[in-house]
Curated annotation (Swiss-Prot):
Keyword flag Chloroplast: yes
Entry protein name: DNA-directed RNA polymerase subunit beta'
Pfam families: RNA_pol_Rpb1_1, RNA_pol_Rpb1_2
Gene: rpoC1
A single MF term (Gene Ontology): zinc ion binding
Comment on bound cofactor: Binds 1 Mg(2+) ion per subunit.
EC number in record: 2.7.7.6
Organism for this UniProt entry: Populus alba (White poplar)
Length: 682
């Protein structure tokens, strides 16, 4: 439906029999009302045409071919001069055949039938509203027992005996056997109530506002009593309070949505449009039919049998009528939700029938597969892998996916640059993967963001915008810091790619949806792009070396290493000391690491511009060295000071590793970039 703000939305709920009748009934130009499906047939075996008043009737659901009736006559659709608007012989209107996708029919049930979703699904809505055990209501629905009608004025047979539910239950095999159909109907209408009709009467007598008042009052009284000290009684009171809360919420929902409780019992059963339950002809002339058609046929067969028992036959025992009502209830249950009451119904090949619930629920159901997860143009899907060299707002898009997503833009670029004369030539160049195609593709992608989505999209960070770049392979490369927002892992997860086409969508993607603009959780405001898993392990490896200072590394015999950071035998080199290398700047240290002269965690001395105020004055040097040029080296735990003869500081070296240098440079570049961005913004 469409609300007042012109937003399309879908709402599922109970409807009244009058609303079902308004949806399904239609008045033909001759005044005839059609819409009721009375025959369990589909197509005639000789003519292959839909049977009249059957499950595919053209009078009820519309013509199979646009503007052509069942007789074969043709009229122009929408031409007001064409008269009449329907075929007087077969009663089929001359309308578009697409009407068979939304025009419904109905089955008029011979007895009320309880909707199994409201009865058997947990929590049971009917049991909550009536405040009765579910097992007792099931016995009433499936005619296992009856209850006496509350007649105040007239003294009835059962009231004179003072009988109630469980006494009548013992009579359920005796009373119907001595009564015919007509006599049993008279007796039942006066004395007892059973089946879904009894549930309907109980629901119709409910006053939802009184339920709200009494339930709230009882909950308040239970809360004032407090704990009794008996664990069993306290649990019982707690369960009762939870039940009252559910009952109040359910009653409020019914009042708010203007739904009457008795609508949970069906008198008219809607029949889906034929295009949603098709019969398809395959090779060899065989027909494949939807399981729902077979379930509808079963309902119609049993309903017609019950109608005959109630109207035509006068000598049928009442027990047979009750049994047939139970069969109708079970047939409708199977149509709505096969297997909800136990063993599911199967066909001749021992295959379970797919009921209405199976068609709409789950990942392959109508909503998630066709409406929410349907395939759209300008979209793709692939596995995600980590791209540590990418920027936070970039993602790597495989060439195979990129050329398909941006094919129309590439074709326009080829034609504009006079590299192709028409669309066909441009597509040929794309199929042959000429080098010029990749150049134009990169130009197109440079100014066009893409959207990445990972299902299920539970919050707004489940879909974010990125600037794509071409990568080799068939997997989408993603920066590891954006993983948490998508709740994804690099263990085979897949993501969908979408291309925003309109200028409004592209502007929204750039201004609101880019990944570097969604660093905080929208729920609690905490940072969501934080290092985890592999990144933490990498940072640990970078900074794990040289953790215990110079003393532990130099004088521990198990830590003796050469200049290549290789372990040496401490006993064989007892008098040999390996000097740690000195570097004037970080570039020399990184160069030595790339030349494999040192390892990532090898300790080294790096010349550093360190403020003398940061040096602790009370710290005593571990040892001192005198150089040949008169310099004096004071060695501390994590730094070294070089002084001249006059005790003046010439330089300061810090003891570090290549991993620490890499981490420091990354942090320094990030801070400089942030400061530059702030200065550009001001």
């Amino acid at each position: 439906m469409i609300d007042r703000y012109k937003h399309q939305q879908l709402r599922i709920g109970s409807v009244s029999p009058q609303q079902i009748s308004a949806w399904t009934n239609k008045i033909l130009p001759n005044g005839e009302i059609v819409g009721e499906v009375t025959k369990p047939y589909t197509f005639h075996y000789k003519t292959n045409k839909p049977e009249k008043d059957g499950l595919f009737c053209e009078r009820i659901f519309g013509p199979i071919k646009s503007g052509i009736c069942a007789c074969g006559n043709y009229r122009v659709i929408g031409d007001e001069k064409e008269e009449p608007k329907f075929c007087e012989q077969c009663g089929v209107e001359f309308v578009d055949s697409r009407i068979r996708r939304y025009q419904m029919g109905y089955i008029k049930l011979a007895c009320p039938v309880t909707h199994v979703w409201y009865l058997k699904r947990l929590p049971s809505y009917i049991a909550n509203l009536l405040d009765k055990p579910l097992k007792q209501l099931e016995g009433l629905v499936y005619c296992d027992f009856s209850f006496a009608r509350p007649i105040a004025k007239k003294p009835t047979f059962l009231r004179l005996r003072g009988s109630f539910e469980y006494e009548i239950q013992s009579w359920k095999y005796s009373i119907p056997l001595f009564l015919t159909t007509q006599g049993f109907d008279t007796f039942r209408n006066r004395e007892i109530s059973t089946g879904a009709g009894a549930i309907r009467e109980l629901l119709a007598d409910l006053d939802l506002r009184i339920i709200l008042d009494y339930s709230s009052l009882e909950w308040k009284e239970l809360g004032e009593e407090g704990p009794t000290g008996n664990e069993w009684e306290d649990r019982k009171v707690g369960r009762r309070k939870d039940f009252l809360v559910r009952r109040v919420e359910l009653a409020k929902h019914f009042i708010r949505t203007n739904i009457e409780p008795e609508w949970m019992v069906l008198c008219l059963l809607p029949v889906l449009p034929p295009e949603l339950r098709p019969i398809i002809q395959i090779d060899g002339g065989k027909l494949m039919s939807s399981d729902i058609n077979e379930l509808y046929r079963r309902v119609i067969y049993r309903n017609n049998t019950l109608t005959d028992l109630l109207t035509t036959s006068r000598s049928t025992p009442g027990e047979l009528v009750m049994c047939q009502e139970k069969l109708v209830q079970e047939a409708v249950d199977t149509l709505l939700d096969n297997g909800i009451r136990g063993q599911p119904m199967r066909d001749g090949h021992n295959k379970v029938y797919k009921s209405f619930s199976d068609v709409i629920e789950g990942k392959e159901g109508r909503f998630r597969e066709t409406m929410l997860g349907k395939r759209v143009d300008y979209s793709g899907r692939s596995v995600i892998v980590v791209g540590p060299s990418l920027s936070l707002h970039r993602c790597g898009l495989p060439r195979e996916i990129a050329i398909e997503l941006f094919q129309t833009f590439v074709i326009r670029g080829l034609i504009r640059q006079h590299l192709a004369s028409n669309i066909g030539v441009a597509k040929s160049k794309i199929r042959e993967k000429e080098p010029i195609v990749w150049g134009i593709l990169q130009e197109v992608m440079r100014g066009h963001p893409i959207l990445l989505n990972r299902a299920p999209t539970l919050h707004r960070l489940g879909i974010q915008a990125f600037q794509p770049i071409l990568v080799e392979g068939r997997a989408i490369c993603l920066h590891p810091l954006v993983r948490k927002g998508f709740n994804a892992d690099f263990d085979g997860d897949q993501m969908a790619v979408h291309v925003p086409l309109s200028l409004e969508a592209q502007a929204e993607a750039r201004l609101l949806m880019f990944s570097h603009m969604n660093l905080l959780s929208p729920a609690i405001g905490d940072p969501i792009s934080v290092p985890t898993q592999d990144m933490l392990m990498g940072l640990y490896v970078l900074t794990s070396g040289n953790r215990r200072g110079i003393c532990a590394n130099r004088y521990n015999p198990f830590n003796c290493r050469n200049f290549q950071n290789e372990k040496i035998d401490a006993n064989a080199n007892k008098d040999k000391y390996i000097k740690e290398p000195f570097f004037c700047n970080s570039y020399d240290a990184i160069g030595a690491y790339r030349q494999k002269r040192i390892n990532l965690e090898s300790p080294l001395w790096l010349r550093w511009q360190l403020d003398q105020g940061l040096i602790a004055s009370r710290e005593a040097p571990i040892e001192g060295h005198f150089g040949s040029l008169g310099t004096y080296h004071e060695i501390y735990g994590h730094y070294l000071i070089v002084r001249n003869i006059k005790k003046k500081i010439l330089s300061i070296y810090i003891r570090t590793t290549v991993g620490h240098i890499y981490l420091y440079r990354e942090i320094e570049e990030a801070i400089q970039g942030f400061c530059q961005a702030c200065s550009d913004g001001t």
